[in-house]
Amino acid sequence: MNDPTDTLYHQTAIHKLAEIGKNCKHLGIIFIHGGAWVDPLNTSNDFKGIAGEISKVIENNNTQGFNISMFGIEYRLSPSVKHPIHITDVITNTYKLINEYKIDILYIVGHSVGATLGLQLATDNRDYLIKYSSQLHLIRSTIQGLFLLDGIYSLQELLKEYPTYDSFISKAFTNYELEFQDPKEYLDKEQQFIKNLSFYIIHSFQDELLTLRQTDYLVELLKAKEISFNLSISDYGRHNDVYINDRVAKLIIFNILSNIN
């Protein structure tokens, strides 16, 4: 039987933005889509618009010394699969991308549940990920920054605010209380890969599906853990407008360029 992640990997949308020279470092931006772990309407193509906006910025700015590419990553959805398949698919496909495209520096952009998966990819250290240790070591030594757009970070807090959201959580998890680890349990500034990680948290005032409660939760957690972060709260549109907003695109790429130039 073929590895199902092979198929998912070949569905990955690739946006090659700049190519400076063979000896340049390769900087990759990987987008992880949302959709509450269940929605087939959200795909790796969600970020095509923002890729175009980022491309415009790159064309007008100095990226000498870097090849820059963008990738939209895919993962299997519930109810066909349950946790931890979503995150292990993301790990597998990210690892393949890094190896196949020789990515030296990586930034992750996650929207909604994609932000959840991005945070897990970069920081989660639960026992169920032990067999992915070698892949995670490479991934985490390559990631320099996380852009978390209107994300979900605590299922317990989410269900307190939106009890009806159990309709999709129950499809994604057999028992979320046992299976979903709150980031307060694993975010630790003393871990080397977190020391070197830049956090960019973005949220829209106009988000009709998530209030600021999730963002506030993560912000307060990072403060308590003394982990530095950047926060942008503005009118970036409704929930599914955020990942196509041109101001968000500029925020992402200008922050990346400021780190490499």
Swiss-Prot record:
Chain ranges for the short sequence motif HGGXW as given in the UniProt record: 33-37
Any one GO molecular-function label of the UniProt entry: arylformamidase activity
Catalysis performed (reactions): N-formyl-L-kynurenine + H2O = L-kynurenine + formate + H(+)
Highest taxon of source: Eukaryota
GO BP, one annotated term: L-tryptophan catabolic process to kynurenine
Pathway where it operates: Amino-acid degradation; L-tryptophan degradation via kynurenine pathway; L-kynurenine from L-tryptophan: step 2/2
Catalytic residue positions: S112 (nucleophile), D207, H239
Keywords: Hydrolase, Tryptophan catabolism
Enzyme Commission number: 3.5.1.9
Keyword Amino-acid biosynthesis in annotation: no
Cysteine disulfide links: none
Subunit structure: Homodimer.
Comment on protein domains: The main chain amide nitrogen atoms of the second glycine and its adjacent residue in the HGGXW motif define the oxyanion hole, and stabilize the oxyanion that forms during the nucleophilic attack by the catalytic serine during substrate cleavage.
HAMAP family according to UniProt: KFase
Record-stated family: Belongs to the kynurenine formamidase family.
Function text: Catalyzes the hydrolysis of N-formyl-L-kynurenine to L-kynurenine, the second step in the kynurenine pathway of tryptophan degradation. Kynurenine may be further oxidized to nicotinic acid, NAD(H) and NADP(H). Required for elimination of toxic metabolites.
Name of the protein in its database record: Kynurenine formamidase
Source organism per UniProt: Vanderwaltozyma polyspora (strain ATCC 22028 / DSM 70294 / BCRC 21397 / CBS 2163 / NBRC 10782 / NRRL Y-8283 / UCD 57-17) (Kluyveromyces polysporus)
Gene: BNA7
